From Swiss-Prot:
This is NAD(P)H-quinone oxidoreductase subunit 2 A, chloroplastic. The gene is ndhB1. One of its GO terms (cellular component) is chloroplast thylakoid membrane. InterPro entries: NADH-Q_OxRdtase_suN/2 (IPR010096), ND/Mrp_TM (IPR001750), Ndh2_N (IPR045693). It is found in: Plastid, Chloroplast thylakoid membrane. It catalyses: a plastoquinone + NADH + (n+1) H(+)(in) = a plastoquinol + NAD(+) + n H(+)(out); a plastoquinone + NADPH + (n+1) H(+)(in) = a plastoquinol + NADP(+) + n H(+)(out). GO terms for biological process: ATP synthesis coupled electron transport; photosynthesis, light reaction. The lineage of its organism: Eukaryota, Viridiplantae, Streptophyta, Embryophyta, Tracheophyta. It holds the Pfam family Proton_antipo_M. It comes from Lotus japonicus (Lotus corniculatus var. japonicus). One of its GO terms (molecular function) is quinone binding. NDH shuttles electrons from NAD(P)H:plastoquinone, via FMN and iron-sulfur (Fe-S) centers, to quinones in the photosynthetic chain and possibly in a chloroplast respiratory chain. The immediate electron acceptor for the enzyme in this species is believed to be plastoquinone. Couples the redox reaction to proton translocation, and thus conserves the redox energy in a proton gradient. It comes from the Eukaryota. NDH is composed of at least 16 different subunits, 5 of which are encoded in the nucleus. It is a multi-pass membrane protein.
C-alpha cells in the first residue's frame, strides 16, 4: 500500500515537472529561438551521421552554415525589441546581449568555411568537429543571455568542454595532447575558482542567484561593502581572467594555440574572447555595482600586465601561432579599457566596435596561416620569407590583416583603437591609454618584421618551403580564400564606415 502511494506521488511529481517544462518551452521558447535553431541543426547532424552509410560531407557543412546564418537572421529580426526575462529568470533578452550573440554567430559562420579544406586535407573526423563547434557556439550564446549564477556557470562550461575536445582533436599529435592537458587542468582550476567566487556572492546576498536580485539582496543584508564581496570579486576576477587570457592567467594560451589545429585556434581566438567579454561586462556591472572602484583597479592592473607582457613576448616568438597567441593577450588588454569605461563615456560601444573589427582582422590572419600551412606544412615565421614572389594575393592579404591588427591607418584596426582609446581618455584613464598607445607601437614592430619577410625577394633568404611553394595545390576558389577575402575586405574598408557601426553599438547599452 505504501509502495503504491509513493508510486502515485512519483508519477504526479513527474507530471508536474513535465507540464512546467512544457509550459516554459511553449511560452518562453521564442526568447531562445536562435539557440533552438542551433539545437535543431545539431540534432539533424547527429541523425544524418548515425543513419547514413555514405556521408555527404557537403551536406554537413551546409546544415551547419545554414543553422548559423538562420540564427543570425532571427537575431536581426528581433533587434530593438523590448528587454525580456524568460525561463523563470534564467535568461534575459536585450540588445546588449544580442549584439554579443551576433558576434559569436558571425565568428562561427566565418570559421566553418575556413576549416573545410583543412579537415579534408588532414582527414580529420568532420561530423564531430562541426558538432563541437556548434555546441560551443550554443554555450557562448547561452552565456551572453544568462541572468543567474547557475546558468552563468553551466554555459561557459559547455563552451569549455567543447574547446578542450577541439584543441585535442588531432589525437596522434603529441603537442596537441600536451596543450589539451594543460588547457583542461587550468580550465578546471579556473572554473573551481569562479564558482567559489559565486558561492561568496550567493551567501552575501542572502541566497539570491539572479543578477539584479543579488544587488537587491546585498542592499537588504547591508553586505555590499563587506569583506565577503571583496573575496568574491577577487575569485571571480581570477576565473574570468583565465577565460579572457588576461595576464597572469595566460600561460595556457601559447601552448594551446601552437598545439591545436589551426582552424580550432581561429575559432577559439575570437569566440572565447567575445563570450568572456560579455560575461565580464554583466558580472562586473550588475552584482559588483557597489564595488566599481575596486574592480576598476583590478582590471586596470590586469589590462596593463596583459598589454605589456603580450606585446613584448610576442617580439621573441618564432612560431606564427605563438606570436598571435601573445598578440591576442595584448589585444584583450585594449578591450578591457572599454569594460572599465562602461556606458557613461561610450566604453561599451567602443568595445563592441573593436571586437567586431578584431574578428575580421584575426580570422583573416588565421585564414592566411591555414592556407600557407596546408601548402608548406610549416608554422615558422622565417619560412614565410619571400612569399610575395610566389603568391602575391596571400602575402598581401596577410600583410593587410597584420597591419590592421597593429592599428595602422586607414585600416579598420586603427579606427577601432582610436575610438577605444579616445573613450578611455575621456573617462580619465590617462595612464592606461598611454600604455595602450605605447604597446600598439611595439606591436607594429613585430607585425612589420613579418611583412618585411613576406616581401623579401633575395634568394638567400627564401626558404625551401617557399621555393617549392605551389600556387594552387588545393581546389581553386576554395573556401579558405572565401573567408580570407571577406575578412580582408572587412579589415580594410569597415573602418571608413564606422559611424553606422558606432550608432548600432550605442543602441546596445543597458
Amino acid at each position: 500500500m505504501i509502495w503504491h502511494v509513493q508510486n502515485e506521488n512519483l508519477i504526479l511529481d513527474s507530471t508536474r515537472i513535465f507540464m512546467k517544462a512544457f509550459h516554459l518551452l511553449l511560452f518562453d521558447g521564442s526568447f531562445i529561438f536562435p539557440e533552438c535553431i542551433l539545437i535543431f541543426g545539431l540534432i539533424l547532424l547527429l541523425m544524418i551521421d548515425s543513419t547514413s552509410d555514405q556521408k555527404d560531407i557537403s551536406w554537413f557543412y551546409f546544415i551547419s552554415s545554414t543553422s548559423l546564418v538562420m540564427s543570425i537572421v532571427v537575431l536581426l529580426f528581433r533587434w530593438r525589441e523590448e528587454p525580456m526575462i524568460s525561463f523563470s529568470g534564467n535568461f534575459q533578452t536585450n540588445n546588449f546581449n544580442e549584439i554579443f550573440q551576433f558576434l559569436i554567430l558571425l565568428s562561427s559562420t566565418l570559421c566553418i568555411p575556413l576549416s573545410v579544406e583543412y579537415i579534408e586535407c588532414t582527414e580529420m573526423a568532420i561530423t564531430e568537429f562541426l558538432l563541437f563547434v556548434l555546441t560551443a557556439t550554443l554555450g557562448g550564446m547561452f552565456l551572453c543571455s544568462a541572468n543567474d549564477l547557475i546558468t552563468i556557470f553551466v554555459a561557459p562550461e559547455c563552451f569549455s568542454l567543447c574547446s578542450y575536445l577541439l584543441s585535442g582533436y588531432t589525437k596522434k599529435d603529441v603537442r596537441s595532447n600536451e596543450a589539451t592537458m594543460k588547457y583542461l587542468l587550468m580550465g578546471g582550476a579556473s572554473s573551481s575558482i569562479l564558482v567559489h567566487g559565486f558561492s561568496w556572492l550567493y551567501g552575501s546576498s542572502g541566497g539570491e542567484i539572479e543578477l539584479q536580485e543579488i544587488v537587491n539582496g546585498l542592499i537588504n543584508t547591508q553586505m555590499y561593502n563587506s569583506p565577503g564581496i571583496s573575496i568574491a570579486l577577487i575569485f571571480i576576477t581570477v576565473g574570468i581572467g583565465f577565460k579572457l587570457s588576461l595576464a597572469p592567467s595566460h600561460q595556457w594560451t601559447p601552448d594551446v594555440y601552437e598545439g591545436s589545429p589551426t582552424p580550432v585556434v581561429a575559432f577559439l581566438s575570437v569566440t572565447s574572447k567575445v563570450a568572456a567579454s560579455a560575461l565580464a561586462t554583466r558580472i562586473f556591472d550588475i552584482p559588483f555595482y557597489f564595488s566599481s572602484n575596486e574592480w576598476h583597479l583590478l582590471l586596470e592592473i590586469l589590462a596593463i600586465l596583459s598589454m605589456i607582457l603580450g606585446n613584448l613576448i610576442a617580439i621573441t616568438q618564432t612560431s606564427m601561432k605563438r606570436m598571435l597567441a601573445y598578440s591576442s593577450i595584448g589585444q584583450i588588454g585594449y578591450v578591457i579599457i572599454g569594460i572599465i569605461v562602461g556606458d557613461s563615456n561610450g566604453g561599451y560601444a567602443s568595445m563592441i566596435t573593436y571586437m567586431l573589427f578584431y574578428i575580421s582582422m584575426n580570422l583573416g590572419t588565421f585564414a592566411c596561416i591555414v592556407s600557407f600551412g596546408l601548402r608548406t606544412g610549416t608554422d615558422n615565421i622565417r619560412d614565410y620569407a619571400g612569399l610575395y614572389t610566389k603568391d602575391p594575393f596571400l602575402a598581401l592579404s596577410l600583410a593587410l590583416c597584420l597591419l590592421s591588427l597593429g592599428g595602422l591607418p586607414p585600416l579598420a584596426g586603427f579606427f577601432g583603437k582610436l575610438y577605444l582609446f579616445w573613450c578611455g581618455w575621456q573617462a580619465g584613464l590617462y595612464f592606461l591609454v598611454s600604455i595602450g598607445l605605447l604597446m600598439s607601437v611595439v606591436s607594429i614592430y613585430y607585425y612589420l618584421k613579418i611583412i618585411k619577410l613576406l616581401m623579401t625577394g633575395r634568394n638567400q633568404e627564401i626558404t625551401p618551403h617557399v621555393r617549392n611553394y605551389k600556387r594552387s595545390p588545393l581546389r581553386s576558389n576554395n573556401s579558405i580564400e572565401l573567408s580570407m577575402i571577406v575578412c580582408v575586405i572587412a579589415s580594410t574598408i569597415s573602418g571608413i564606415s564606422m559611424n553606422p557601426i558606432i550608432e548600432i553599438a550605442q543602441d546596445t547599452l543597458f
